[in-house]
Amino acid sequence: DETLLKEVIAAGIVSPRKMGDMEMYSPLDREVLEIIRKFNEYGIDVRNLKMLKRQAEAEVSMYETKVQPIFLRKNPTSKAQAEELLDNLIELGEQLRSTLVEVAARSFRGNRQS
């Protein structure tokens, strides 16, 4: 939906790349747009989802403090080490975030799950 796309762009959640008169979206941008569309079907709007983008940026900023020094080394294997570390940190962040959401949602579940 064009209106939703405009809202997502205006919120800074995705930024198309201009190629002449065309706007191009990366595969990750398209995935983000599809997920936002699904949230929108549940009545969760772009304004609320922008919070998740800010949290993701803050999370990556935290990882950067550990990964960037490794990227900057002159060692030929440093880039691979930094990429592996970043992948590991992203995976741990996903696990922690998912678990914390489940913990926070316990009150809605009647504390049936611990």
Model-flagged regions — what are they?
Residues 2-114:
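Arg/Lys-rich, alpha-helical DNA-contact motif
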